[in-house]
């Protein structure tokens, strides 16, 4: 519980994509990104190493790669505009950076939704020392 409180306090000072990403996951996957994916596998949460453990962890790996390709902007803080129509996310910005970051978040949120059956509680708070092997290229 203390960890969730610390995360909540930290998020109060965060604007832009991370908060929007959380809301997008809630709208699409119907679950909290912070709770379910904040510390999952080898790639969900801060950093990443080794090989993704399952399809859910791979969603985070792909998201990390996508953020790494964002050019001329900080994907974790940029704010973007999106809407949800008929359960589908539509990224609405014309700005290339905002559009790219929104698309990264959209793809990950849909990936989480589509891979809920692969979620394995054994990978929640998975120790980094268990994340072995050469990382795959993005």
Curated annotation (Swiss-Prot):
Q: Which reaction does it catalyse?
A: a 1,2-diacyl-sn-glycero-3-phosphocholine + H2O = a 1-acyl-sn-glycero-3-phosphocholine + a fatty acid + H(+)
* Molecular function as annotated in GO: calcium ion binding; calcium-dependent phospholipase A2 activity; phospholipid binding; toxin activity
Q: Which cofactor does it need?
A: Ca(2+)
Q: What class of enzyme is it?
A: hydrolase
Which example biological process does GO assign this protein? phospholipid metabolic process
Q: In which tissues is it expressed?
A: Expressed by the venom gland.
Alphabetized PROSITE patterns for the sequence: PA2_ASP, PA2_HIS
Residues of the signal sequence? 1-16
Q: List the disulfide bonds.
A: 42-131, 44-60, 59-111, 65-138, 66-104, 73-97, 91-102
Q: Do you know which SMART domains this protein is assigned to?
A: PA2c
List of residues binding Ca(2+): 43, 45, 47, 64
The entry's free-text remark on the cofactor is:
Binds 1 Ca(2+) ion.
Q: Which UniProt keywords apply?
A: Calcium, Disulfide bond, Hemostasis impairing toxin, Hydrolase, Lipid degradation, Lipid metabolism, Metal-binding, Platelet aggregation inhibiting toxin, Secreted, Signal, Toxin
Give the main location: secreted
Q: Which GO terms describe its cellular component?
A: extracellular region
Q: Where is the active site?
A: 63, 105
Which EC numbers characterise this protein's activity in its record? 3.1.1.4
The record ties this protein, via Pfam families, to: Phospholip_A2_1
Localization per record: Secreted
Q: Which family does it belong to?
A: Belongs to the phospholipase A2 family. Group II subfamily. D49 sub-subfamily.
Described purpose of this protein according to its UniProt entry: Snake venom phospholipase A2 (PLA2) that shows very low inhibition of ADP-induced platelet aggregation in platelet-rich plasma of human, rabbit and guinea pig. In vivo, shows efficient edema-inducing activities in rat paws. PLA2 catalyzes the calcium-dependent hydrolysis of the 2-acyl groups in 3-sn-phosphoglycerides.
**Protein name as it appears in the record:** Acidic phospholipase A2 Cvv-E6g
Record organism: Crotalus viridis viridis
């Amino acid at each position: 519980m203390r960890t969730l409180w610390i995360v909540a306090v930290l998020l109060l000072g965060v604007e832009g994509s991370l908060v929007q990403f959380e809301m997008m996951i809630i709208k699409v996957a119907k679950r909290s990104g912070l709770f379910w994916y904040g510390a999952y596998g080898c790639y969900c949460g801060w950093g990443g190493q080794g090989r993704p453990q399952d399809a859910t962890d791979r969603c985070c790996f792909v998201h990390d790669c996508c953020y790494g390709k964002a050019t001329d902007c900080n994907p974790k803080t940029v704010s973007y505009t999106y809407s949800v129509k008929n359960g589908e996310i539509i990224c609405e910005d014309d700005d290339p950076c905002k559009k790219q970051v929104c698309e990264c978040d959209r793809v990950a949120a849909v990936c989480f939704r589509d891979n809920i059956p692969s979620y394995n509680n054994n990978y929640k708070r998975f120790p980094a020392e268990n994340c072995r092997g050469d990382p795959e290229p993005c």
